[in-house]
């Protein structure tokens, strides 16, 4: 998503060594004014999305410094007051309508798509989904699924029933042994969040969505049942 906006900001491209303070200030101004794609109503980018895009660009420039493509990160010359401010008061979650829109929006990263939707319907953290193995999911004589794990973050053991919607978004097991990870190959949390933005934009959702949004979504759905 960041690359798409950089291409729209400078259609003819720019050499890495020519990315300076002026270029970055112009990009910040572009982010403030540009309209969301795939959205019926004309809306500018959410301030949290602007913040995230700039953070991603900073990371890329830091990598360029570490790889000796450039000597300094020009982002360090930008004053904090000139950067988009993250709105920390909001705890975004997906409404049922938005979640349904995501469910019906195809995406090239099928594994991440399944993992995110699975989290929406069961509430597991990204770190627990990455560690999840087929042996952690058991079925009783009635076909009801129960997930039992020790949470990575809290070290607490939990057991929770899996609804049919959660089970629907599990990958196809095939002949995988019980010890194999359910979501084998799922990328890191940071990378997952970068990729999620593309899917959310395709679905026409304007909220700042990260993998953790799935937990908020699940918690909100539980409160409304």
Which residues does each predicted region cover?
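Amphipathic, well-packed alpha-helical segments that form the structural scaffold of globular domains
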Residues: 1-8, 25-32, 58, 79, ...
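N-terminal DNA-binding recognition helix of tyrosine site-specific recombinases/integrases
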Residues: 2-22, 36-77, 125-127, 198
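Short basic/aromatic active-site micro-motif
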Residues: 19, 51-52, 186-190, 206-225
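Basic, Lys/Arg- and aromatic-enriched nucleic-acid-binding interface segment
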Residues: 43-47, 51-55, 66, 70-126, ...
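Exposed loop/turn and edge beta-strand positions of beta-sandwich/beta-sheet ligand-binding modules
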Residues: 44, 88, 112, 143, ...
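C-terminal catalytic core of tyrosine-transesterase DNA break-rejoin enzymes
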Residues: 66, 117, 121, 127-128, ...
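Conserved tyrosine-mediated DNA breakage-rejoining catalytic core shared by Y-recombinases
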Residues: 77-82, 122, 131-172
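C-terminal catalytic core of Y-nucleophile DNA break-rejoin enzymes
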Residues: 88, 151-171, 177-198, 210
């Amino acid at each position: 998503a960041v690359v798409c906006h950089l291409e729209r900001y400078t259609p003819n491209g720019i050499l890495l060594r020519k990315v300076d303070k002026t270029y970055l200030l112009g990009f910040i101004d572009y982010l403030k004014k540009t309209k969301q794609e795939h959205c019926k109503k004309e809306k500018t980018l959410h301030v949290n999305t602007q913040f995230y895009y700039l953070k991603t660009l900073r990371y890329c420039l830091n990598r360029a410094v570490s790889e000796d493509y450039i000597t300094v990160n020009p982002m360090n010359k930008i004053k904090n007051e000139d950067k988009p401010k993250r709105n920390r008061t909001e705890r975004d979650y997906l409404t049922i309508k938005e979640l349904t829109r995501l469910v019906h929006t195809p995406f090239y990263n099928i594994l991440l798509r399944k993992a995110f939707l699975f989290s929406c319907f069961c509430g597991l953290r990204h770190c627990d989904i990455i560690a999840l193995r087929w042996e952690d999911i058991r079925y009783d004589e009635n076909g009801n699924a129960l997930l039992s794990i020790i949470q990575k973050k809290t070290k607490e053991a939990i057991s929770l029933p899996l609804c049919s919607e959660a089970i629907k978004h599990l990958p196809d097991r095939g002949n995988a042994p019980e010890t194999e990870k359910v979501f084998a190959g799922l990328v890191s949390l940071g990378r997952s969040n970068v990729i999620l933005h593309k899917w959310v934009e395709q679905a026409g959702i304007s909220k700042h969505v990260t993998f953790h949004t799935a937990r908020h979504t699940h918690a909100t759905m539980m409160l409304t049942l």
